[in-house]
């Protein structure tokens, strides 16, 4: 496979950039046989061009032609491009350098976009930011899913650009370029530090980084995939959340911060955008790009982070220790959770700075006194008076409803001694670039360990440990000795903490290898003993005359009197528990989140045991489901609820049907009413068919242990009966909507959503269709904004009753569905540009024109519900992929009244498209929803800055507090004076050593005032998705937003505006 040339000798920050360029230019003759040969252009320069260079530089950005494997055509194209380049060199040169750049850019070939990384195939882009993009990847053999973060190698890109520039004119120009080069080198160091820290951290609320690959132009980091989305999406759905749910999220964040601070690590960029939610509603902290290692005896001087979540000492450019900055950011995050907005906000950045420095917070009336008490202790301007993390986790609001503070999940550690120092751990620290020299680091560790203070703390540790072990021997709990004195195993020194983390990572890897070896040997023993065991079983059971399969017939020739077990009437043996390995029993390449949708409860129990706050003997192992996990009926018990809520049955049906009578290799039997239900797919049709009925699902064989043969088989003409019943149901729905529209005309405008639902279901005898009585609440107390969600109940169960024509199997071929949480807009293979809307594919339809009728609603005239349903009933199957292929989703507490609707899905689809057109938002309808993009021209941006509040035009999530190393360095995109107040409110520092800087945010702010001549360029567009999902339990249609790229807080306001316009 033709690929980038991989420079295995590359090492960032070791002063060998020049050797790197020479090694790449000569490596085509010394390349290993396992690597694909790189072409001359992929190597950067041809030999003739390389000889003309006076100073060796790194090669330019690698490129590759889309030749579909035809290397001969690629070589011809390269020769042709080289000849064109030579002809341009011989041609007379223009007077201006700009014209030469334009001519050279026109001759540049198309840039290569990678589609895979080893065995991982890129599926789609799920996020983008200033540092790079995140792609979803699927393993081609194991079908595991992971998130691949792709970051440009800043130094390589900078040196490539330098080649295109004229040589420096004077010494000052040389110094300026050298400063820029050092800044790019520090960016690469920051990326490598993020990867190194991510590999050694191991916590259930921290997104795991499994591997990092360094290629010629990019860093590829393989993270576990958290499919639940960002916490920001959760807040958009609700505006704000209830305190008991916010407490659960806050305890997860606090647990992760305890673990980080106990290992001398400070995050420094904690914000809503960097917190993800898994399918089990557990949080995961991501993005350690700005994290650093702190020492409690010293202070940091790097001022970084996002403005809205940055502590006042960062804005004042005061030095800090580290943990207090995370406590402030934690307080802002908690405020956003319970209030739905940031505590400090203003359209003028100068006023916003002053508000943050003053720290005056206004709390909404619906907040409890306890949470206000906690927030008032965290959002304190003076870091010395601010609550510590220990005080936060022990606050009565944080422990309400729980047995105590959140656990830290730190494994059991003991104080180090000289004899315990392992050279292999030091070498691993060197490989991860935490240290520069192994022997020097060992000397530093020895000096720390032999220090009298550390020796005294170690003796106290063992004394108190022995005492508390004796006291806790009755209940078996581990001693908690951190409250009595300073624990030498927690945040004593950063070098010791990194040694602990690296050692624990190696222990986990070694334990995993041992488990794999033991499993393989155990499986081999089982295979060898399989034949005699089966013979013994047949000696005890029934006759062999009922045997039909070949393996049993072969065994029957040895002993004709062997009885046969009556459990499987078709005669097949169930050796699956021996031959098929467990789902998580795979190599180190398994990168699926342990809280993903496919995981079972057994996996979660083992993960909780592995990462329990009480140290266990096997804390360093990576746990997985063993090959024999007990009775398979136990799996069916905890799997039933998930099979009801989603239609993804797949392997679960196979596993549970193996042990049921007359069910092996046979379709699931269904009653006549089951035939029109959407819970079990009929025949070979896809399970995502858009046929919505409210029939109660019948328990199948895979969800019950008994009553296997109670239901009769389907008749031969079942499909025709189903089609007739569907057509009849459609006619009834249309007639019913006639009556509904007549009734709605008589309802007052201010009657509210519940009155509307009551009118729709008036005359029904079912009590659950009537709206619930209003809540009895005292008038002196304001309700939480989401409290009205409890009043709907089952009164709005109408949207799933409308049925679209069935999808023919030929229109969309059936394939294995991978629910990644994102829509199938496979545009990554065509272009990585955010501004390009790709052409029509099999899974999507092109952007709709304004003049279309039902498929693209016109802004001038809005159709009535009756007209929409009539058009939808006549529309061919597959013409509305957003509702023809809906998703079944139910995340606990994820949907509210504002994001759910009782109306039929065609009406929901039409309203979404109508609002998008009305708001001039580009969109593309795909399976399950819409991919949308909001562009901002310079006029729109200027108008928004003048007329919109600060909350609508906030800073981007990547426009963080940054310290400029030089006043002469201008940003890549020039801005107006007002925009510099908003975009350059921070101090970015190169992510290297923390050195004191006299540059403060005020100085940066003054620098922005002097740039009167700058003009505004087009703002980065916002790309997001709108999912149309089926909320099964309550029988409603839901709308779910997911951000892909762009300004985070502007996206939040845009999504909120869309929800208000929808009026679901």
From Swiss-Prot:
Compositional bias segments (type: Basic and acidic residues): 74-91, 598-608
GO biological process: exocytosis; positive regulation of exocytosis; positive regulation of IRE1-mediated unfolded protein response
Residue ranges of domain KA1 in the record: 1015-1064
EC annotation from Swiss-Prot or TrEMBL: 2.7.11.1
Biased composition (Polar residues): 8-36, 93-108, 557-571, 654-670, 832-843, 963-989, 998-1016
Feature: compositional bias, Basic residues: 779-794
GO cellular component term, pick one: plasma membrane
Catalytic residues identified in the record: 269 (proton acceptor)
Function: Serine/threonine protein kinase involved in the regulation of exocytosis. Induces phosphorylation of SEC9 and its release from the plasma membrane to the cytosol.
Protein name per UniProt: Serine/threonine protein kinase KIN1
Organism field: Saccharomyces cerevisiae (strain ATCC 204508 / S288c) (Baker's yeast)
